[in-house]
Structure formats: C-alpha cells, structure tokens
Design a protein with these regions (language model features):
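Rossmann-like NAD(P) dinucleotide-binding subdomain of oxidoreductase/dehydrogenase enzymes
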Residues: 1-130
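ALDH superfamily catalytic-core signature
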Residues: 87, 95-239
Length: 241
C-alpha cells in the first residue's frame, strides 16, 4: 500500500469559524504533501491573510500554499471547475455545495463537502437535568451561527412546560453586546444578509402563529444599530411553519 499526495487541492472555507476551518483543511493537505489554493469566505477574509503570513514566515516553499480572495460565484466556480486542480474541499451551504459538485464533475475531480443542516435536539423526560439549559446555550453560542446549532428542540410531553420555562429563562440570561467589549456576551451577526434572513424568520414565526416566548425582531436593549439579534425562542411550533 502506498499513500501518495492527491496533488493540487482547492480549499473553500466558511465565515462562521474562519481560522478553525482553514486549519482543518490546510494542515492535513500539507501533511499529505499536497499543494493548495485556499479561498476563504469573502465576508471573513482576514483570518486567511494572517494564516498566509504565518505560512510564509514558517518557510514553506513558494507555490505550496496559495491564497486567493474573492466571492464564490467567481473564484469558487473557477476553483471547482479548473482542470489543473485535483480535489476541492468545501464547507458551507447546501446550495453552494450542489453547484460545486456539478462544476467539479466536468473534470472528474475528487470532492469533499461539509454542508449545512440542522438536526433536532431531542430531550426526554429522563434526560440529565441541565439538558434544556445546555441546549439553549449551545444554540446561542457564536451568536447562533454554528452549523451544528440544534435550533429545534423536541421535548417529551411530560416535561414540556418545565422545558419551556427553563429555555426562556436561559435565553433571557444571555447578554448581547458589541464584540470589542470584554465580558460574557454574544456579538452581532456577520452581515446584513444574515441579519435580514434571521429577522425574516422571526417575523415569519410570529405571522404563522407560533408563540414568541423570548426575544423578537427588535434590537436588544441599549443597542440602536448593528446586526444584533435578541436570543429568541418560539413555542407551539409545528412542522408546517
């Protein structure tokens, strides 16, 4: 058995954990002896630039690691369809992943995709006592922008009322403030597009008849601008919403 480098790898990373995702893709490729082209998210590019500077300072030969900034429609499509790139690794939305897979098929390159998706957080009556509170904190960490955030909580009926009270109490404890301040709080969403998407979903939940138990579409107290969203919880939700 021989292990050989794949060759040139196109690495496309998301905005929600920029440096983490860069490291997870670049280091294994380097260790395997591959060369690579990294395209970080266009709305979170600074981590990629800093990482490129570290690679340069570490003394890697020119051409082993290459950084290209730009949007997905232009740079991402070029990477996924380029005949001289042997593999593309993408983390991001399912919509973009479909486009990358179709584009890569033209050159029969290897593709790895880690795509968005939300699974329900299931809490049974005999679950450990802090399951609901821990679940809410998990959802709200990173300002709710984690790809594995369990944004739906499915609770067994005998503990439903208690679970609602605990979830609302925990959400109301979470402070929202500017990221530059020290302290135990969450910051704003990453962009206007993401902010508008979340606010539209909150308004849709209200319009479709779910009970707004915490939070809402208004800016948090003492914040009069920015992409800040209150930790929001709906109850009485059904699968048709």
């Amino acid at each position: 058995i021989r292990y050989e480098p794949i060759g040139v790898c196109g690495l496309i990373t998301p905005w929600n954990f920029p440096l983490n995702q860069i490291v997870l893709k670049v280091i294994p490729a380097l260790a395997a002896g591959c060369t690579m082209i990294l395209k970080p998210s266009e709305i979170a590019p600074i981590s990629g630039v800093l990482f490129a500077e570290m690679i340069d300072e570490a003394g890697f030969p020119p051409g082993v690691f290459n950084l290209v900034n730009g949007n997905g429609e232009v740079v991402g499509n070029h990477i996924s369809g380029h005949p001289d790139i042997d593999m593309v690794s993408f983390t991001g939305s399912t919509r973009a992943g479909k486009l990358i897979q179709k584009n890569a098929a033209e050159t029969i390159k290897k593709v790895t995709l880690e795509l968005g998706g939300k699974g329900g957080n299931i809490v049974f009556a005999d679950s450990y006592p802090n399951a609901v509170r821990d679940g809410v904190r998990h959802i709200m960490s990173n300002s709710g922008q984690s790809c594995d955030a369990p944004t739906r909580m499915l609770v067994e009926r005998p503990i439903y009322e208690r679970a609602v009270k605990e979830a609302v109490d925990e959400a109301n404890k979470i402070k929202v403030d500017v990221a530059s301040k020290k302290g135990d709080h969450i910051g704003p969403l990453v962009s206007k597009i993401q902010y508008d998407k979340v606010i539209n979903l909150i308004n849709a939940g209200i319009k479709e008849g779910a009970t707004l138990a915490a939070g809402g579409p208004e800016l948090p107290d003492e914040l009069n601008k920015g992409y800040f969203v209150k930790p929001t919880i709906f109850t009485d939700v059904n699968n048709n919403m």
